[in-house]
Regions:
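N-terminal Rossmann-like dinucleotide-binding module
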Residues: 1-36
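Beta-loop-alpha module in the N-terminal Rossmann-like domain of NAD(P)-dependent dehydrogenases
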Residues: 5, 37-99, 296
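C-terminal helix-rich "cap/oligomerization" subdomain common to oxidoreductases
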Residues: 56-59, 255-258, 290-291, 303-347
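Hydrophobic residues in well-ordered beta-strands that form the structural core
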Residues: 59, 82, 107-109, 245
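Predominantly a Rossmann-like dinucleotide-binding segment in NAD(P)-dependent oxidoreductases
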Residues: 113-198, 204, 338
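Contiguous beta-strand/loop segments that form the cofactor/metal-binding neighborhood of enzyme cores
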Residues: 170-257, 298-310, 347
């Protein structure tokens, strides 16, 4: 994600890059050479903040550093674009949001699907299906090589159900416009000498119930053992019909563009005619002209710039981020304890 965001800033007329930070010498070199070594590079984040005095910071690091790095930037008066998840705990997430409000700085989260035109249409069509909704989603990734190394690093702090789940719970919240109230989850540790972190699971599935009666499930699994069968399910059913994303059949489950690309939207209408048969044919909406991953990151950064320039209120955006984080963390607790978790939404 960091490279894609750096490309977006490099190409943007709204931002000028003051410095690039990466703790590893090799990754720092790749980052610098991408832009012809034209920007200062740093191996230490705090040193970079002190020496460059930036107006804004983009944080695309491992999840367990997010809250601490965002705190350092906000305390220096910087606006912050922060990749998901907001923090590893709900308490830390709430503290970061409170700090942004205290200093009057913009805090934007990297919910990339909020800026994807096909996913925006997916949400809109789901809202037309009536209530309650049944939402079925997953993203399983059969990973190896560098992709598996990245997954192992992320799992040092959280399982895939949490890391990826915040995206899709956010989508469900936007589809229902309702509060999540109850969560249950299962998980499994699939390891045969692959080096999973101690105590960590690389497969999980959660079920969430919303206040309006809508229900959803989300499944995520990572690793060399994962099946590619039905790895990309994005399907919503309501009393009036259903809408589904038809994924491209040739996509690889660990290819980053496959995580957002839709292929087409299929809309099914439940209405019946006088003869008892369907009154309307299914609609297939092609989405051939979708933005790629770098373009989506550019759209995120354009919105970040707009939020700063026009002083947009990020309150609803941050509240949704808290809800999605609350659900996936509750799911992890449920899977660990075997209990159904009732959510406290008294904020």
């Amino acid at each position: 994600m960091g490279m894609s965001h750096a490309r977006a800033y490099h190409a943007s007329s709204a931002f000028s890059i003051a410095g690039l930070v990466s703790r590893g010498e090799e990754s720092r070199g790749r980052l610098s050479s991408e832009f012809g070594d034209m920007y200062p590079t740093f191996g230490d984040y705090e040193d970079a903040l002190r020496r460059t005095q930036p107006d804004a910071v983009c944080i695309s690091t491992w999840p367990d550093t997010h809250a601490a790095y965002a705190t350092l930037a906000l305390e220096r008066g910087c606006h912050v674009f922060l990749e998901k998840p907001l923090a590893a705990t709900l308490a830390d997430a709430e503290r970061v949001i409170a700090l942004a409000r205290k200093h009057g700085r913009k805090l934007m989260l990297g919910y990339i699907l909020q800026h994807h035109p096909s996913w925006m249409r997916f949400v809109t069509e789901a809202r037309n299906l009536g209530r309650p909704l049944v939402m079925r989603m997953n993203l399983n990734q059969q990973s190896s090589g560098s992709e598996w190394k990245t997954h192992l690093q992320i799992m040092q702090s959280m399982p895939p159900m949490v890391d990826c789940g915040v995206h899709y719970i956010d989508v469900m919240c936007r589809m229902t416009r309702s509060r999540p109230v109850r969560v249950h989850a299962i998980q499994a540790r699939l390891d045969d000498g692959f080096g999973l972190p101690d105590g960590q699971c690389n497969y999980g599935q959660l079920q969430v119930v919303f206040a309006d009666g809508s229900v959803g499930w989300y499944e995520a699994g990572w690793g060399p053992m994962m099946s590619r069968t039905a790895f990309f399910v994005k399907d919503v059913i309501g009393p009036r019909g259903s809408v589904s994303i038809a994924a491209e059949r040739h996509e690889s489950s660990d290819e980053v563009n496959a995580h957002t690309r839709t292929g087409a939207l299929r809309i099914h209408h439940a209405s019946l005619g006088p003869d008892g048969h369907f009154a309307r044919m299914d609609e297939v909406i092609p989405t051939d002209d979708e933005p790629d991953h770098d373009e989506l990151c550019a759209r995120e950064q354009a919105f970040f710039a707009k939020a700063i320039r026009e002083d947009l209120d990020p309150g609803e955006h941050l509240e949704a981020a808290l809800y999605s984080l609350q659900v996936v963390l509750a799911a992890e607790e449920s899977a660990r304890t075997g209990r159904v978790i009732t959510l406290d939404n008294a904020r």
